[in-house]
Amino acid sequence: MSSHYEAPIRKPLVTGNKSYHDVSVDIAAAIEGKANKQWWIVFSIALVMFLWGVGCMIYTISTGIGVWGLNKTVGWAWDITNFVWWIGIGHAGTLISAVLLLFRQKWRMSINRSAEAMTIFAVIQAGLFPIIHMGRPWLAFWVLPIPNAYGSLWVNFNSPLLWDVFAISTYLSVSLVFWWTGLLPDFAMIRDRAVKPFQKKIYSLVSFGWTGRAKDWQRFEEVSLVLAGLATPLVLSVHTIVSFDFATSVIPGWHTTIFPPYFVAGAIFSGFAMVNTLLIIMRKVSNLENYITVQHIELMNIVIMITGSIVGTAYITELFIAWYSGVEYEQYAFLNRATGPYWWAYWAMMTCNVFSPQLMWIKKLRTSILFSFFISIIVNIGMWFERFVIIVTSLHRDYLPSSWTMFSPTFVDIGIFVGTIGFFFVLFLLYARTFPVIAQAEVKTILKTSGDNYKKLRDKK
């Protein structure tokens, strides 16, 4: 009993007096039942957004990237803004799965599966932007170090854009393996419950012959720990490499050593906000309030509050170093952000990312589901503006006043971005109907320590 003991002060992580069988039934319900009206409405909207985005991508590829709002001064704009934003959103999944696993945090078990799915779907969206940004996406394979017949013809390993290729591909592959490994016992549970022969065959195939023997569990736990060890450095390295796209250049406002930690903190910040957005909706639609509790939402809000404070500190540090450096160009770059033509984007960023998360210090607000949902949306809007401010305001006024200009997005820029949001939700909604959205095998392991009925029984003794 002592090895399973949990202090009474800790709130239960599973409510509703659940048994092992109840957990299986509740999590399999979304897969075994029929989609409700709300699911079809949201899926239809997401599909229309996705198709609009596909149309804009086809138009871009067939006509050229001149259909975007780019000009000779602002060569990177919405494409790279959206790329960095999507990559950042993916970071929370790896952090919840890998880092919290290594720290043995039990509250991760109800949210890690959907957070990992979000990571993979976000990285897919991010990967689209560098490909279409090339202008000739049919030559995208040129950025891969493929052996060729030309001997010394090789990729430029000094290019940060090549580092992005390695970062994204490594991140996607490790996240996918980690996600699928965790899914094996859950797929096996769906397989064993399946009534239709075709469904049974599909889930048998994807569960890789899982039987639930002690040897299966031993290997499962070993592989999970090894993959967590591999994925933890990726949380830091991927967004660090993305920050090098900017930090290794000589543009004022980009050439700064604070970018790697600043980008990583911002990525975790926006990622947790997106996890909150998705899980608050999912817990309501899929009747999972007993598994994704207010306790989970509150803990994620605390992470958002802390990382928001780190991001705010980074903003202030940037301003201080620009002044302290004595470099006129650096000072102007930051002054222009706050008071120039794009002042509205800068102050939207500051309001959303620095001021709004500080409201989470108030317990009543951070335990409010409605307020948490509102703040999670605000934070993601703010993080998009942060990337826009970093990229566009640094480029539109550089060293030569004669080349100063403004950037305005076209309907194609907007369409591609809206399309990726639609694609993301199409993937997530299909996932919610075909995959177990909560790691039921892991939730069952904490039922006797963190389940409310067991805690009540123990307290009575």
Where do the protein language model's features map onto the residues?
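Membrane-helix interface "capping/anchor" motifs
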Residues: 106-107, 361-372
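Central hydrophobic cores of alpha-helical transmembrane segments
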Residues: 371-381
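Extracellular/periplasmic helix-loop-helix junctions in multi-pass membrane proteins
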Residues: 251-255, 327, 365-366, 391-411
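Transmembrane-helix bundle segments that line or gate the permeation/cavity pathway
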Residues: 2-18, 57-69, 73-76, 83-214, ...
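Extramembrane terminal tails and long inter-domain/linker segments of multi-pass membrane proteins
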Residues: 1-38, 141-157, 186-222, 295, ...
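Long, contiguous internal "core" modules enriched in hydrophobic/ aromatic residues
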Residues: 29-57, 148-346
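Hydrophobic cores of alpha-helical transmembrane segments in multi-pass inner/ER membrane proteins
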Residues: 86-96, 164-182, 265-280, 348-359, ...
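C-terminal TM-helix exit segments that contain a strictly Trp-centered aromatic cap at the helix terminus
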Residues: 53-60, 127-137, 314-321, 382-393
